[in-house]
Amino acid sequence: MTVSVGLAGDWHGNVSWAMSCIRRFAAQGTSTIYHLGDFGLWPGGTGNYYLKTLHRACDHRGIDMFIVLGNHEDYHQAAAMHLDAQGWLFLENYPRFRFAPRGHTWVDAQGARFAALGGAGSIDRNTRKIGVDWWPQEELTQFDCDRLVANVNSQHWPRVDVMLTHDAPAGLRRFGMTARPAWFTPEVEDYCAIQRTRLRHAMDEVLPRWLVHGHWHDYFRDSWDGLSASGTDYRCEVLGLAADGMRGNAVIAEVIPGFGLGEITEFLP
């Protein structure tokens, strides 16, 4: 049995764009949205308005949203979240939203195996202020990756069907900076690159059939021919989603247990 879900890339707290996506998902009969990070978990009144507005829209339409946190998120607010019985984090006033801890795994109602590994480095972190618009907890650590591998191994999964991340793994051909802004430093580039390498190594351990990510603000499809940690070849299909205001930010995808994703339909809000 298969089911279709919504997949969305970075929204950056953009209320009008996010609302357009939610309306379009609902119009297609989608009741589950997986968000790939830089969702818009922000402090203060602006952040609260964003959460309230989107939650009201989801609740009215019977939509549940499962969110992988990115790098541009308020991690102080995330640290205060509660943990539910299924291992998801949540904010008390927003029961339609669930946030994936780093390394979280779950099986959907149809039996598809999912894993989530959020976080990424901010290449522009030197232009940001800690605790205001940058949080060091954005970093994807080795501990996060080890927890993912342990969670998958504890369930004896031969492969993960769909892996949801914010960043893209190292090794994808088309990623890399072509310009060097004035604020750029090699140290920060290394900080970001090592996280992508950690992500790739975690991927080689859990062997996803599909990996879906955001962060790079580009709609991207590719096939990954990888080498597992045990030395065997494997293939993973990779889908990167664009950001708010861009084509390829949101898609509807068929989820197939034991296969990953089937038909993918891109739409413009």
Each PLM stretch: what is its role?
Residues 105-108, 204, 218-269:
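Binuclear metal-dependent phosphoesterase catalytic core
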Residues 29-30, 113, 159, 207:
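Short loop/turn motifs at secondary-structure junctions
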Residues 12-19, 40-45, 69-79, 105-107, ...:
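Active-site environment of divalent metal-dependent phosphoester hydrolases
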Residues 57-64, 92-97, 154-160, 198-211:
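A structural motif corresponding to the C-terminal end of an alpha-helix
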Residues 7-10, 33-38, 64-72, 99-101, ...:
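Active-site neighborhood of phospho(di)ester-bond hydrolases with catalytic His/Asp-centered motifs
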Residues 1-6:
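Extreme N-terminal starter segment of soluble prokaryotic enzymes
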